[in-house]
Amino acid sequence: MSKRNTPPLRSSGINTIQINAAREMHAQTVRARRMPMPTSGITTPSVQPTAAPATPPRHICNNPNNPQCLHCGSVIIPSPRATLPLEDNPSISINDWTISSRKKPILNSQELDIWENEKLKGLTLPEMIFGNNYIRIENSKQHWSIEFNALDALKEVQLQDSGIRVAYSNDWINSKKRQNSTNGAQRFTNDVNDDSLNIIHKYDWTYTTRYKGTESSPESKFRLDNDQKLPLDKLAVHDKILFYDDMILFEDELADNGISILNVKIRVMNERLLLLSRFFLRVDDVLVRVYDTRIYVEFDENVVIRESKEFEGKYQDVLAKHRLSQSHDPKAALRDSNWVAQNTPMIKRQCEIIQF
């Protein structure tokens, strides 16, 4: 009887030692994530701490797509639910006041045609228009509201020549004069000037607008009072922000010669709100301009203050105030509207008030 040669058993799979090591490593990780437990062997009956009843917030979140946070009460922006086309309509109410906003994409080609041919005749439109965006502040008891939107802002752009020229315009005119002189057309030399540019549509190509908001009432309820000032002491208090939004209404890069942009932002606290509408213009090597409009509302007192400031200065004068020699981009500060507003002379201030 022959003896069968049986091959030696081969170990397959993961070694038992490796498995145990992996289990121990996992257990250590789990233990590290657990909160430390008391080591005393004496057990005491657990007593549930009695928490004081929380004061119910007086603000109401009106949009179910933008619920308030269960921990801090703030309105959740943007909405957690995605929709097509993209749209966001957060809203909040405090006392008789309701603050709402809407965000949508830039105007499509069909909407642009309607704006250019019907709503804004004679104005060549900016490159980007968020025409369906707005921020609205409304008092339901007084049937009054003020809204910031792109259409009404662009309606205040002048349909005439602003007189502002890009930095190289004089060089272009001088080159034309030299060219005419070289070609023997001396009699036409003096005819090459701004009038010979053949501007078909005369409008302010910088899109400068002194837009201060659109009121619902036919006549403004604001009363001029330049002695009024924004209560900076109240605004300096670190109150919880219940509602915040920030949006662009329109923007244009001026054919790579600068920037023209209108931006609106708002923050709402429990007792007050502050809105800032800022038009920022920078024409490279020519000028900078900032037009600020701030709306302040005190909810309990039903007071509305509107303050407008205009800043303007020559490009090189403002640039000279930027002394960061270690910066690789010395003109970076001129792309910051906050820095420009702080370092540009104020040429006008106006303050108005409403007391309901």
From Swiss-Prot:
GO molecular function, one term: protein phosphatase activator activity
PTM annotation, UniProt: Phosphorylation. Dephosphorylated by SIT4.
Family affiliation: Belongs to the TIP41 family.
Protein name: Type 2A phosphatase activator TIP41
Subcellular localization(s) per the UniProt record: Cytoplasm; Nucleus
Keywords: Cytoplasm, Nucleus, Phosphoprotein, Signal transduction inhibitor
Oligomer and partners: Interacts with TAP42 and NPR1.
